[in-house]
Amino acid sequence: MSKKYIVTLFIISCYCFNVLAQGPIQLHQYPQRFFRYPLDLPPSTAGSFGELRGAHFHSGLDFKTNQTTGYPVHAAYDGYISRLRVQFSGFGHAIYITHPNGYTTVYGHVKTFTPAMEKLIRDEQYKQQSFEVDFKLDPLQMLVCQGDVIAMSGNEGASAGPHLHFEIRDTQTEETINPQLFGLTIPDKVPPTITSIGIYHLDGNPFSEKTPRQFLAVAGSNGSYRLAKPQILNLTGQIGFGLSTTDMTSVSPNHNGIYSCELKVDGKTMYTFAVERFAFDQTHAINAYIDYPELMKTRRWVQKCFILPGSKISLYPQSINRGIIDFNDGEVHDVDYVIKDVAGNTSTLTLKVKSGRAEANAPVLKPAGNLFHYDKVNEFNSDKVKLQIKPGNLYDDLNFTYAVLPRRPGAFSATYAIHNRFTPVHDNYDLWIKPVSSIGKFADKAVIVSTDGALAVGSWDNGYIKAQPHTFGDFFIKIDTVPPTIVPVNIKDGANLAAAKGVYFRMGDNLSGIKTYTGKIDGKWVLMEWDFKTKVLRYSFNADIAPGKHIFELTV
């Protein structure tokens, strides 16, 4: 195996940059003759690269596995197993292979690993005394060749159904790259679908839920779209556009994401978006790309065709004035949307816009509260509440608002409206709330919760409970005095388990969640596996446990 690996290295050094990808809008070129599909199934996807997810851009391709598990997963190319990961949610079970051509492939949600990998993982779990492990391997520790079976497909972790999540990453930068740009194409002759457009009246004001907006239905099919109600749009001032769009392939009915969107005015490109590659620290900035307030209010996904000043994503190859159009010359203009999937199938929509004449000094809304700047440290202080937001954690300037609401039953503080849920933040921020004096001995059990049920576990900090929420909203202090629950499934005191494969429990918590759990047999730590979806904790008997009477102890 190692001999073949060395020969392959030589071939790559000769050819990997001579055969380059030719495709849609992209800033880089990628080798085309190296990677194979990771499954021996006709390629069909349930999720596309870069498609819109709840709080991130999808980072790979989700290959379908006929709604079942157990298909062999193959190494996409020669390389070495560089990382193994087991986690409750996320990918569940994941394998990382580093290749000599500068890329790393990732295989997520697999059911089982090879026996050699299983042993390494088990040894690491016992070493760390943890079910969740994430560790790296030496380059010569576990070599693989293209096509080697490395796992069986599964449904582990935060997976909505059996499939294989597959990624190609830049080994050096760790950016994830669209796998279809490497020639791993999916049969696709279907152009994207456009269902509506959005029009935003910006006029120099920060983007928010108060930004005037309107949505217009779209009619058409097979790549040609128009407004459902034909009209010339009368627009004046600084305007941003958006649209609702999805894409399908020829082999799957799933509604996935598009690859690129280009906005032109009178033939001139003003804005371009393309899901070629991105860094993982940018993925939460999906909330700067979409109309986040509209999603929170109506669950409608609208992709904005203009860029917020604090946006962190590198998916905009080209833009003029951040895609914001000034309509103030009194002329009629053609506005064209050009939407493509990664296969190059194209859909277009053309609008006629009659421009008005904007006032020399368009009115700018006065802040309703404290003006926070997206590129500066922002702080707010009152006698009961403090907060601090680091630079870059907002996507635009913010007219921050704050209010004190009545104390809720069982709460140990008033409820504080920390702005509102319609404005996203990129990362956690610091929030301090002062509890009522009666909290006393319960201070170490205090947590900060929001009225929508989200939890920000707190800690005592100089008279305040400090937490780090990742959203704005209405927050208050509660105390968590109820211990987690443990419900035995197939075990009881004195039970005879000679014929059983293991012991099973259900565990849960009513507020702050499960932090740790520890299982012991006769005082020795044993590996307990937590199933994220079924909420079942299990210990599987193995040769380490001799027949006879044993004492099992579980601490949660």
Describe the residue ranges of each PLM region.
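Bacterial Sec-dependent N-terminal signal peptides
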Residues: 1-31
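Proteolytic processing hotspots in large secreted/extracellular or virion-associated proteins
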Residues: 360-363, 368-374, 400-447, 491
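Proteolytic-maturation and junctional protease-sensitive modules
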Residues: 419-475, 516-518, 525-526
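Short edge beta-strand/loop segments characteristic of extracellular beta-sandwich folds
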Residues: 242-246, 432-436, 502-510
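Long, low-complexity serine/threonine/glycine- and acidic-rich segments characteristic of extracellular
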Residues: 115, 145, 187, 202-208, ...
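Proline-enriched interdomain boundary motifs that mark the N-terminal boundary
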Residues: 191-196, 483-490
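Surface-exposed, glycine-biased beta-strand/turn segments
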Residues: 21-104, 111-116, 131-133, 137-140, ...
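Short, solvent-exposed loop/linker segments at the N-terminal edge
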Residues: 225, 231-236, 423-425, 493-499
